[in-house]
C-alpha cells in the first residue's frame, strides 16, 4: 500500500530558494525535513509499505536528517533534494560559537537501527554545490554525507539515485553498532573456562574476561553481537582471531559455549542469556591491550547500493564498511578528483586520500564491489577489511592507484577491466598471519603493478596485461597462466620481476620490441616477437634463470651484461622458432655470462644465425647440447655471429642433430670469424644435408 505525501499537511514546500540564502530559507528547509520524517512515521504507523514524494525540487539543510524507517520504502519519484549552504554566512541552525561557517556539517538521509528500508528514484545534492571555498582552509572540510548506513542497519538499500557533491562521501557505511563496548574493564585473568561447566580452570596460554553484562534495554532489542577491532587498523591485537564465548543466565548459571568464533562474524545470543565471558587463545599477558570492541547488534550488514550515479564527492564517492554490504552496478565518477580538478572549477580535497570507494576507515567483512563503472578519481578502490570481493568492474582513467589493499585477510579481485590507471593494484602491510589475495581473470591496459609486500600470499592467474609499464612481484606471489601483450611501442622498456612464472604468454603485435625479465624460473611459457632480455634482480651475485618446456617464436633471447653480475640463461625441453640467442658484455670485467640450450627443438626458417655475440670483454659462452636443429633458410650464414672483438667467444656443440631441409646441402659456418673465438668444441654431433667448413 502506497502513501503519497500531502505537502501542505506536513509543512513541506516544493521549490529551491536562490542565493544569497536568508534565515527563512533554512527554516523552510528544516521544515521540509521534519515534514518528510513525520510523513514516514505516519505511513509506518498506518501499515503503508511505500511513501511517495510528489515530484519536485526540495531544499534540505544541516544538521537535521531524513531518518529512514524500518519496513518502509521511500520513493523520491524523480525529485531533487538539495542542501542549501553558505560558506561565508552563519546558518540559523549552527550553534557553534566559531566563525568558520564552512565547517558546519551534517548528513542528509540516514539509515540508523533499521531493517528492510529502501530509498530510490531521485537526486540528492550536497553542500559542495553551494560552497564558495573563499577561505582556502575550506578544502580540508570532509564531514558531510549524503546517505549514511549506520548502527546495525540491515537489508536496506539505495537504488536508482543520483547522489553528488558532499564533502566527505556521497554515500557512506559506518561500521558501528546499536551499542559498543570499547575501552572497558575486562577483568582479564590467566586461566581457561571448562567447556562443560563454564567454570575457571588453570591455563598458561589463555586469557578470560570477567563476567560481562549483555545490555537488555536497547532499542531494537539485540539478538547478536560481534567482536571487532579498535584503533586505526581495527584488526584487534589478538594473537588468534578466533575466540570462545561462554554464556550465563542472570544467576551466573552456565548456559553453553560457542567455540572458535572469528572476529567480524555475528554471534547469536541465547534467549535466556544475560551475561557472557570471552576466552582468548595463545595469550598470557593480563596487561596486554587486546584492542577489540564488542559491538552489540552487529554492524550494518546486507545493505545494497545499486544502479546509482555517485559523483563530485569532495573527498570521495562511497565509504564502504560493515559486513556483507554490496556496491553493485553503479556509475561512480569524478569523486576525489585529481587531474580532472577543472571539471567544475572547485578546488580539490587537500589530502591524497581521494577516491571512488574507500574502506580504509570502515572496517568490516565480506563486502562486495561488483559491476560498477568507476573513473575520474585520484584513487579508485581503497580496501581495508577482513575479506572483500571486487568483481567485474570497469575502472579507468584513475590518476594513481586503481585498487589498493590495506590490511586484510582475504581479497578476490576477479574479472575486472582496468584501463589507463597509473597503478593497477597495490599492496600495503597486512596485520594477519595468513593473508591471501587472489587476482584472477582481469584485464589491465597500461599502468604498472607493484605487489612486493610479502605479508600477503598473492596468486595471479589468467589475467591479461596490455602495454604494461612493469609488473613486480614479491617472494610470496605466484604468476600463472597470464598473458602480456604489446600493441604499441611505449617510450620506456617494460619489465617484470618474479621468482617463477608458469604457463604465461608474452607477445608484441607490431614490431619486435624489448622487455626486461628479472625472473629466475619459467615453466611452459610462450614468447612471441620479443627481445627477451634477462637481467639479474640481485646484481651482487651470479645467478641462473631457467626456461623449461617453453616456446620462443621470432624472438631474441638476450643475455647482456651492462653492470653487476650476470643472470646466465639455461633453456631446456623447449622450442625455439626463428629465435636468436644473444650474449654480450659491455665494459664489465671479470664476468663470464653464458646461454645454454639443452634438449630443445630449434627451427630456423628466416634467421641467419642461431647465436649473436655483442661483447667487448672476454668472454661469453654459447652451449648447444642434445638439441635437434632444423634449418630451412638457404641463406643461413653461421651458428654464431661472433661480433667484432678478438677471443671473446666460446662455442660448445655436444650431442646435437643438425638438419637442413633444402634440396641441395647447406654450406654451414660454425662462426663468422675465427679470430673472435676463444674456444670451440664440436663433440658427437650429426649433420644431415649440410656441408661442414674445412677448417673449424
Where do the PLM segments sit?
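Acidic Gly/Asp/Thr-rich repetitive segments characteristic of extracellular carbohydrate-active
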Residues: 12-52
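N-terminal extracellular ligand-recognition/capping segment immediately after the signal peptide
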Residues: 33, 37, 47-105, 124
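Short glycine/acidic-rich loop motifs that flank beta-strands on beta-rich extracellular proteins
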Residues: 62-64, 83-88, 128-134, 145, ...
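Parallel beta-helix/beta-solenoid
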Residues: 70-80, 102-135, 149-166, 302, ...
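Extracellular polysaccharide-targeting segments
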Residues: 179-205, 212-216, 256-311, 370
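Extracellular ligand-binding interfaces
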Residues: 182, 199-201, 228-260
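Extra-cytoplasmic beta-strand recognition segments
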Residues: 206-243, 265, 269-271, 626
